[in-house]
Amino acid sequence: MEDIENIEEDEYGFSRNYFLAKELGGASKRSAHKLSDIHIVDEQELRETASTIEMKHSKEISELMSDYKTMYSKWVFELRCGFGLLMYGFGSKKALVEDFASASLTDYSVVVINGYLPSVNLKQVLLALAELLSELLKCKRKSSGSLSKGQETFPSRSMDDILSFLHGPQSGDKDCFICVVVHNIDGPALRDPESQQTLARLSSCSHIRLVASIDHVNAPLLWDKKMVHKQFNWLWHHVPTFAPYNVEGVFFPLVLAQGSTAQTAKTAAIVLQSLTPNGQNVFKILAEYQLSHPDEDGMPTDDLYSASRERFFVSSQVTLNSHLTEFKDHELVKTKRNSDGQECLNIPLTSDAIRQLLLDLNQ
């Protein structure tokens, strides 16, 4: 009985103290501080500071990457067998996948889709793939001396017709395929059902092999059983790299930083440095033209192709279109028509920002 009475007294004392504290708290004066009074560091300053942080366990990570390189031949074999490769694990897999493509996929054409971008135009990607496949088939027929013309061009620009062309039996060579690398297939611009269905149909095409990476823990929920086993035909590879998301993080505002609405030269330089040297050189030609012709609507696409081909930065219109698709996906270049009806390319940055961008690229 005494124990029960003691428990009741303790509970009464606790509840009484609780309500007394609430009364005192309600009567107390509120702080005059505001959330806007907090000093928020500049985003560029925060990124520069973060870039100086030394990576820990660099020796172990280097050994881990060396182990992954021994698996490159196996991954190529799996692609040739018709599987899609899905890379998952902690850390950015962008550098690993690109190293695999540059080291082991040299016998194939490779097209890269950056799923971490705010927007991705999949129809433009499919058009570029169809044009590239058409060129590959022409080259193979010339080298084999075949007189059969076959279907060398796709009949229309509808998504269904393009996918049918990519899936068609235009070549008996099982190794006649294009490797499509998708960084962050679970990225914000690709998470909608329509984009995932398009990618699944693309992956099931006979002339396409997919190498993709995911980072979101719930990424597998994007697909149903048919997509996983029959269309994507995934082989899952656990490849944690523990690498920072330097490039992928550029397009997302930092929680602790003050965001900027305008695209800065620093951000554009980081994006361009992730592209191929030829892609950077094509962009430099466009930037230099825009600085020397400030009163024009932009550089005509035909002029950019001629200038790039003269300097051996591109070998065909297909190659230039591939670079332009990357520029547009990164929102580095915009297109519009001038008074003569020509398609012109324009960099949506001020002249000072373009000059600073060229200085950053030349360093």
Curated annotation (Swiss-Prot):
The keyword Lipid metabolism does not apply. Expressed in female gametophyte and embryos, and, at low levels, in trichomes, pollen and the mesophyll of leaves. Follow a cell-cycle regulation with a peak at the G1/S-phase. Mostly expressed in siliques, flowers, flower buds and leaves, and, to a lower exent, in roots and stems. Essential protein. Component of the origin recognition complex (ORC) that binds origins of replication. DNA-binding is ATP-dependent, however specific DNA sequences that define origins of replication have not been identified so far. ORC is required to assemble the pre-replication complex necessary to initiate DNA replication. This is Origin of replication complex subunit 2. InterPro entries: ORC2, RecA-like_ORC2, WHD_ORC2. Disruption phenotype: Zygotic lethal mutant phenotype. Seeds abort early, with embryos made of up to eight cells, characterized by enlarged nuclei in endosperm with arrested cell cycle. These phenotypes are partly suppressed by mutation in MEA/MEDEA. Belongs to the ORC2 family. Component of the origin recognition complex (ORC) composed of at least ORC1 (ORC1A or ORC1B), ORC2, ORC3, ORC4, ORC5 and ORC6. ORC is regulated in a cell-cycle and development dependent manner. It is sequentially assembled at the exit from anaphase of mitosis and disassembled as cells enter S phase. Interacts directly with ORC1A, ORC1B, ORC3, ORC4, ORC5 and ORC6. The gene is ORC2. It comes from Arabidopsis thaliana. GO terms for biological process: DNA replication.
